[in-house]
Amino acid sequence: YTTGTNGSSAYTFTGPGATSGDNPNFTFYKGHTYLIDNTSNVGSHPLQIRTSAGGSAFTTGVTENFNSTTGLTQFIVPHEPSDTSLVYQCTNHGSMVGNITIV
C-alpha cells in the first residue's frame, strides 16, 4: 500500500484492495506479508503499527516499523499473533489512525 494524507487529520491509501476515504480499516491475514510505502510522508507523518491508539509499537513480524529514513514498513503477519486488533498511527498526529484486524 502507498500512503497519502488529508492534511494532518488522516491517512489515505492506494493499492490492491485499499478502501477509499480517510483512515480506512484493514484486514490482514495470518502468514501474509504487507508493505506500506510512506516515503512521501515520512518527514511529516511517520507511520507506526501499534497495539492501540497512542499505545506501544507492535514489533512481532514488523520490520522497519516507523523508519524515519526510508518510510517503508514491512509486516509479516504471524501465524499466532499476540494481538489480533492493531492500529496504524502517525507518531506526530493522533487523529491519523486506523484499525488493522488480523484474521
Q: Residue locations for each model-derived region?
A:
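Solvent-exposed, conformationally flexible loop/turn segments
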Residues: Y29-G31, T70
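Surface-exposed ligand/attachment interfaces on beta-rich extracellular proteins
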Residues: A18-G21, N25-T27
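Short solvent-exposed strand-capping/beta-turn motif centered on an Asx-Ser/Thr pair
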Residues: G31, T39-N41
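Structural beta-strand segments of beta-rich domains
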Residues: P24, H32-Y34
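Extracellular/periplasmic metallocenter environments
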Residues: Y1-S8, G15-T19, N41-S44, E64-V103
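Aromatic/hydrophobic beta-strand junction motif of beta-rich domains
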Residues: F13, I36-N38
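Beta-strand signatures of extracellular beta-sandwich domains
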Residues: L35, P46-R50
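Short edge-strand/loop segments of extracellular domains
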Residues: R50-S56
